[in-house]
């Protein structure tokens, strides 16, 4: 499996001289733009050169057996390419082409059955068909996804190329890298179970994020997730749990979906974190990849304004987290430091001073982080609307990071940067702030609801681990 993600040579079967045509040539262009340092072999019997590279009529004409073949020819011609791969000993194959089982036709079913037969005959490790294939920034295998993409602590397994690409690009926009990802499409040969095992054994991956439409062999998948989940968190976005989505799955990857009740039971019994949206998938993956295990479910909230304090408390308690009272010792220390006017000491903490006075923030976080009732901290980095003529909090981002980093290593600490409201300038400031926090190892979320849901998943996963030790 290593060479699948770290190929030193790639043959692109079906590369074209037409650069505006999606398929082999678009992959070739991306490899060149991303600075892939391995050897690239475009295969096209009608061309002498493609994008400055010598073209070859077929795989047998190559000067070496490449580590990976990317197959981009029309579906009826794919079996012949696989036959050649087997004959020359090329065992790692990514089939980009669609037109197989997902069509729901006898012809598509027959073609996919032939792909499976040839894989069994020659021992081919096939990703696909009908997929974008493997992605690995460390090796330059970035024909899709974020470019340039830096490696990071996350592995992604998905049956959708578009969804996988969206997640890699969103994570990269926050300065968070991906170690490896795979879009596996119909998963005819290599499936979720195979990639789960590979990523479980990769020491660079801390969290595995999955988008699934079908789990393949359910018993094997259940066993593997339950075993791996006690070592690494697995975040699953399951498509097609309701009727309309399930109908779409059949034409997308030719899979059959399971019911919502089945997946809820699966999550309870395996410790897998089941999420319901792209945003929740990304938010939870970020929290699990950056934060330590919380000791409990008690959350300290630092916010500004009495109404915000009330609403935020409700949001976190709705997610099953606690907003506990602080100890008498903590309360005494807070009262000595909280301004009398416009502030309320306690949990939540209502103090605008924390937005603009780094020393005040440092004192407060040190006090509450020492309180045994507090397992996690949430700091609101409100971007002040254009009122009150108060200094811009974005100027304090680096100082805030300096204060929160040592706290976050002891107790999970996140920030919320709510910059909506339709103001483009404030929106851009919010994006910039969230990126800097995430780059520094502190998850940052655009809403309190998203922060609460991510911390609820973090807490539930580590509670499961404590209850199910290795």
Language model feature labels by segment:
Residues 1-470:
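Catalytic-core regions of core metabolic enzymes
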């Amino acid at each position: 499996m290593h060479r699948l993600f770290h190929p030193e040579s790639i043959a692109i079967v079906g590369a074209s001289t037409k650069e505006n045509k999606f398929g082999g040539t678009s992959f070739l262009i991306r490899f060149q733009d991303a600075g892939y340092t391995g050897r690239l072999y475009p295969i096209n019997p009608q061309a002498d050169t493609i994008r400055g590279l010598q073209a070859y009529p077929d795989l047998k004409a190559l000067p070496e057996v490449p580590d990976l073949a990317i197959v981009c020819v029309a579906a009826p011609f794919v079996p012949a390419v696989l036959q050649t791969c087997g004959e020359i000993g090329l065992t790692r194959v990514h089939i980009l082409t669609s037109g197989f089982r997902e069509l729901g036709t006898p012809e598509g079913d027959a073609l996919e059955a032939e792909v499976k037969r040839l894989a069994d005959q020659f021992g081919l490790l096939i990703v696909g068909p009908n997929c974008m294939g493997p992605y690995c920034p460390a090796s330059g295998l970035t024909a899709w996804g974020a470019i340039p993409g830096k490696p990071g602590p996350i592995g992604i397994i998905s049956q959708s190329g578009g969804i996988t690409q969206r997640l890699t690009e969103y994570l990269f926009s926050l300065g968070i890298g991906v170690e490896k990802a795979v879009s596996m499409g119909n998963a005819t040969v290599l499936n979720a179970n195979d990639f789960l095992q590979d990523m479980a054994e990769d020491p660079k991956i801390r969290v595995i994020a999955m988008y699934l439409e079908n789990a393949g062999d359910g018993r094997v998948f259940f066993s593997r997730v339950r075993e791996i989940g006690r070592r690494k968190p697995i975040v699953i976005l399951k498509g097609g749990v309701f009727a309309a989505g399930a109908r779409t799955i059949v034409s997308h990857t030719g899979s059959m979906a399971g019911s919502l009740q089945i997946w809820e039971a699966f999550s309870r019994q395996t410790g897998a974190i089941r999420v319901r949206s792209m945003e929740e998938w990304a938010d939870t993956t970020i929290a699990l990849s950056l934060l330590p295990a919380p000791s409990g479910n008690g959350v300290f909230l630092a916010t500004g304004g009495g109404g915000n304090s009330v609403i935020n408390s409700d949001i976190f308690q709705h997610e099953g987290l606690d907003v506990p009272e602080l100890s008498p010792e903590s309360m005494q220390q807070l009262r000595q430091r909280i301004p009398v006017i416009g502030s309320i000491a306690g949990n939540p903490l209502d103090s605008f001073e924390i937005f603009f006075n780094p020393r005040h923030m440092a004192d407060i976080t040190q006090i509450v982080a020492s309180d045994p009732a507090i397992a996690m901290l949430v700091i609101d980095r409100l971007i002040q609307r254009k009122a009150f003529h108060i200094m811009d909090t974005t100027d304090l981002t680096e100082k805030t990071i300096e204060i929160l980093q040592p706290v976050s290593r002891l107790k999970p600490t996140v920030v919320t940067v709510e910059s909506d409201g339709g103001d483009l300038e404030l929106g851009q400031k919010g994006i910039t702030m969230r990126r800097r926090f995430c780059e520094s190892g502190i998850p940052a979320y655009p809403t309190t609801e998203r922060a609460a849901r991510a911390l609820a998943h973090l807490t539930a996963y580590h509670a499961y681990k404590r209850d199910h030790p290795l």
